[in-house]
Amino acid sequence: GNFNYTLKGSTVLVIIGFLILLLIESRFHMKAPARVAKRAALILLSIVLIYGYTGMIQSESFVRSFGLYDKLFTPTVMNKRDGNIVAFLMELEYMDVEKPSGYSPEETGSKYTQAGQDSAGLTAAVEDPESVKRPNIIVIMDEAFSDLAVRGDFTTNEDYMPFIHRLQQGAENTRTGYLNVSVLGGNTANTEFEFLTGNTIGFLPQGSVAYQQYVQKETPSLASYLKELDYHTVAIHPYYASGWDRDRVYPLLGFDEFLSQDDFTNPKRIRNYISDESSFAKIIELYENKKEGKPLFVFNVTMQNHSGYEEEFHNFTPDITVDGIDSKALSMYLSLVKQTDSALQGLIDYFSQADEDTMIVFFG
């Protein structure tokens, strides 16, 4: 088959424990005074079995082998499919985070000192912080956006991201590059968490979602830092506000305001989602209505390009095809990317003519 089965220590512990329980129950018939010892032994073995069983349930290989549902985004589905006990034991894994090796104030301080020495001369000292310009900062984390050309060459009937390709050729006031993220095909909130806080999910238990498990109090982030610099901080996500607990988490990260799909009036939709064009128009609306003299920070997590890509929709017809590849999903995806490219051009063109300095950061 396609599975490789390995016996972990916790699995062996459970098997041995069950065998001992069977042996005690079948071979020993104790008199009343000795029953206390028997019960104590059974309680101890039960604790050992629970510990071992929990370890098995929390094993990634066990979860995959038995097809358990482990997506924390939908805990009700998790409970329904796996059962309440299994779901509860699986979630216990995320209650504790082990401190990474070498993590201490002394070690961290020395690394900051070294980083400062390495960057000496790259930044100029600011004598008067009040004189420093505070540009508006717009960050767009575009759902599922990527340039598939990094995976290999292919030919399309037309360019699917002409504007971004022009930017990559050295446009004025532009820096481009490639970004690796820690998630693939899900757990969008973990990329948000890493970008906003500078932390890494590499230090968290496998499968955890930082927003849901670990952001339970005010947490330093880019938003809270800019808020201290008198920025008005706004998060935008044109979908359900409760997704990944954003409505609870964003205020803890320092956002003054959170706009979800309920804050859009008659937006343009592509497939089932609010388009990037409408999402970017909301940014422009915020800029045009902001308080004069107060800089704006916007963090926009879009929805337009969310999977899946196989369905047909009355409000969107894919117009990008790939030579030699007959794939509805590929055609749909590249056509959506083209829509994003056009929307991004409109946003950048607008702020290129705006009165205030504005920095736009875009990544997928």
Regions found by a protein language model. Give the residues of each.
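N-terminal secretory/membrane-targeting segments
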Residues: G1-R134, T155-A171, R175-T176, Q212, ...
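Solvent-exposed soluble domains appended to multi-pass membrane proteins
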Residues: A120-P135, V139-D142, D147-G364
